[in-house]
Amino acid sequence: MGKARRSPPGHHRHCEGCFNRHCHIPVEPNTSCLVISCHLLCGATFHMCKEAEHQLLCPLEQVPCLNSEYGCPLSMSRHKLAKHLQVCPASVVCCSMEWNRWPNVDSETTLHENIMKETPSEECLDTALALQDQKVLFRSLKMVELFPETREATEEEPTMNGETSVEEMGGAVGGVDIGLVPHGLSATNGEMAELSQEEREVLAKTKEGMDLVKFGQWENIFSKEHAASALTNSSASCESKNKNDSEKEQISSGHNMVEGEGAPKKKEPQENQKQQDVRTAMETTGLAPWQDGVLERLKTAVDAKDYNMYLVHNGRMLIHFGQMPACTPKERDFVYGKLEAQEVKTVYTFKVPVSYCGKRARLGDAMLSCKPSEHKAVDTSDLGITVEDLPKSDLIKTTLQCALERELKGHVISESRSIDGLFMDFATQTYNFEPEQFSSGTVLADLTAATPGGLHVELHSECVTRRHNKSSSAFTFTCNKFFRRDEFPLHFKNVHTDIQSCLNGWFQHRCPLAYLGCTFVQNHFRPPGQKAKVIYSQELKTFAIKPEVAPELSEGRKNNHLLGHGGKSQNSLTSLPLEILKYIAGFLDSVSLAQLSQVSVLMRNICATLLQERGMVLLQWKKKRYSHGGTSWRVHREIWQFSSLFSKIKSWEFNEVTSMSEHLKSCPFNIVEHKTDPILLTSMCQPREQARESLVSTFRIRPRGRYVS
């Protein structure tokens, strides 16, 4: 017999399974209810008790945006949600375009020096973008990482492999009280010495000493240990009991002898001695890996199979506590409680054969092995001067060269490398900087803030390829601009595809004699339909469109002020009604709205009315700490702003500029060199009387006839 099915709360027995729009069943309590239509006129008809369910499906129901948790304040009909996501202010995309820009330490710097002598121009796009990338590069190069010898003596080097000293472990979470740290734990090198049983118990009872991150690894070890030890409990219980009884009798007789002698000793030393004897007895009878003689007791108590299983599960602990030798000669190879992933390093595994005899010297001189030889290192000391007397190294060029060497070659300068099994190359490089010591947080930008600016990177950039390791590269730059989802395709096409990738020779054309130092540059393209030019703003760190103002409008700026009610000068633009100002602001692009909002309070309020339609919202997160020591990230506030997108440009038009040949006629670097002195040709350098070789003369030289043997 089946169980009776109950209707959902609020539903009637008939209404639960009725889907007829023309249902005419009479209304009865607890059975059926009236059939109604949706009050939003979506066309649905249903029983009145299903109205709450219909609100979850009605396409005309007002619901918040799907990105309401990310800051979107708009509400709309349910059927408009998908279309709204394309223009949602909370649907933000970060541009991940990357490019490489290398330093110019090996190239000619005449052009870079001449460019920096001139006044910086917004129209020189490659120079402005290179200067911006140079600022980012200088803020990312840490001096201590490139030159570890220049670290300040007061600072300690960071611990390797994530190990921290005892002094650094203090805190609310995961900290260890210094008073509870056993004597076997060194605070300097972080190595764990062998602990006594009393120190283990104190450390185990201390809640602050627990390493919760490695709890799973500890639990796995102890579970295997318990499983292996459980096999030996039954066989070793009798033997351990007999030994304990005999040792207790010896301890009690010893105490009676001491009391009978009547020596003037206190009770506290006797109790300490008793506890020490008990611990000694436990150390010699237990089967734990840290107890003495555990392997000898296991050999007699269990069979070979259980003994080998115990070694497999407790091998690391037995090696650490000195019960068995390690498989490698390195001491302290396995540290209990520090089960960290070891970094895989490539080593040279070449072994010299027994019959190998190195005779590299005979490759050049057979008698070199007979000559006396001596070991001598080539170093800066061979110059006969001290390091202080050496000329100061260029800080910027030296830093960029060392960073470039590690990036392109894969290793630092002066790295030792093994040639074969017998020889190794050693190299040293001495640098003498003006500041002799650097702190751990010092970057190259901090040291070059007071020096005059210069251009130390290439003007042209390169695309990132698969051969280049961009994860740890200091010369890989990222756009990292935020845009709304509908703005991102326009940004990528206009900025990265049309402008940035075509700066070297197409969108922007430099003089052919630029390698000699000529700074002349031409921009070939402009937006269609208007007189404007493309610029790069250092303040906004992005490209923008700057319209060309007519001369008559520039002259009328002086008379562009009116007198207000208080006799003060009032700008004619601010005197317009708010509706007209908002209408005018609607024609501006996002980057122009961002600049207009910083003009005055009135313009800021006008631009604020366009934020939901043209702007985007970002969440600022803040880390919150609780009283128990835990942390979490919470939304601190919402930030509304405009993106850096300029006007949409589908196609470009050619600028009305003169030909580059016209510039070459007056280029100061285009110097014509007239050759007046005669120059000998190649054929004139040889002797004039020379036998002419021909095919006939070649055959005449050959002897005729046959040789008879």
From Swiss-Prot:
Task: Give a yes or no for keyword Nucleus in this entry.
Answer: no
Location in or out of the cell: Cytoplasm
Task: Describe, from its UniProt entry, the tissues in which this protein is expressed.
Answer: Expressed only in heart and skeletal muscle.
Entry-linked InterPro entries:
F-box-like_dom_sf (IPR036047), F-box_dom (IPR001810), Fbxo30/Fbxo40 (IPR031890), Znf_RING/FYVE/PHD (IPR013083), Znf_TRAF (IPR001293), Znf_TRAF_N (IPR043013)
Report the GO terms under cellular component.
cytoplasm; cytosol
Q: Which GO terms describe its biological process?
A: muscle cell differentiation
Write out the biased-composition intervals (Basic and acidic residues).
Answer: 240-250, 262-277
Q: Name one Pfam family in it.
A: zf-TRAF_2
Q: Give GO MF terms, alphabetically.
A: ubiquitin protein ligase activity; zinc ion binding
Q: Does the keyword Zinc apply?
A: yes
Record region (Disordered): 232-280
Note the coiled coil stretches, chain numbering. none
Domain F-box, first and last residues per copy = 570-624
Residue spans annotated as Zn fingers (TRAF-type) read: 53-112
Alphabetically sorted, this entry's keywords are:
Cytoplasm, Metal-binding, Ubl conjugation pathway, Zinc, Zinc-finger
Q: Extra info from the record?
A: The expression decreases in the dystrophic muscle of Limb-girdle muscular dystrophy (LGMD) patient.
What does the annotation say about its assembly with partners?
Directly interacts with SKP1 and CUL1.
Q: What does this protein do?
A: Probable substrate-recognition component of the SCF (SKP1-CUL1-F-box protein)-type E3 ubiquitin ligase complex that may function in myogenesis.
Record-given protein name: F-box only protein 40
Originating organism:
Homo sapiens (Human)
What's the gene? FBXO40
